[in-house]
Amino acid sequence: MNILKDKINKEGIVIDNRILRVDMFLNHQLDIELLNEIGKEFKNRFKDKEINKILTVETSGIGIACVVAQYFNNVPVVFAKKHAGSNMGENVYESKVYSFTKDIEYTIKVSKDYIDKEDNILIIDDFLASGSAMSGLIDIAEKSGAIVEGVGIVIEKEFQKGRKIILNKGIQLESLAIIKGFEDNKVVFK
């Protein structure tokens, strides 16, 4: 997706040839025009799927997922919580995930009230790197009996193992910008 790659090249900041900051348009401040283009692109790539729910993980995926949902007939968006409050109760699906950026393991949780075997889920997130968050979301969906129709990623770090993990599960993966690596603190796209 050229508009996304251009935005990454113009505004993204690479730190230590390993971390890409895009918080200025994707996961802190949101560029709504760009998110609408992302939503259209995911709709095009998953147009043959009968999606009735979008699943993501807090917090960076929520804004993206909400815009994407508008292109799938305003289906509900469910997000896995990293820090479930006492009002969530114990009737939850949960899975452990590791955050590459924060170097922390979380237990993510989704209430059993919001996903079940009737759901055809599209998982949406901002980044795919090690695949831990996606594995956790897929695990939660599978525990609920839902069908994971696909995974939509805005930016993928191809040089990490996330892609392989998802494809080995037989799930359609669509990434809008795929990064081969970093050189001299610049992004190298596939």
UniProtKB/Swiss-Prot annotation:
Enzyme Commission number(s): 2.4.2.22
Cellular localisation: Cytoplasm
A single GO BP: XMP salvage
Transferase as UniProt keyword: yes
Recorded superkingdom: Bacteria
Matching HAMAP family: XPRTase
NCBIfam families linked to this entry: PRK09219.1, XPRTase
Purpose: Converts the preformed base xanthine, a product of nucleic acid breakdown, to xanthosine 5'-monophosphate (XMP), so it can be reused for RNA or DNA synthesis.
Identification of the protein by name: Xanthine phosphoribosyltransferase
Organism field: Clostridium tetani (strain Massachusetts / E88)
Species lineage: Bacteria, Bacillati, Bacillota, Clostridia, Eubacteriales
Gene: xpt
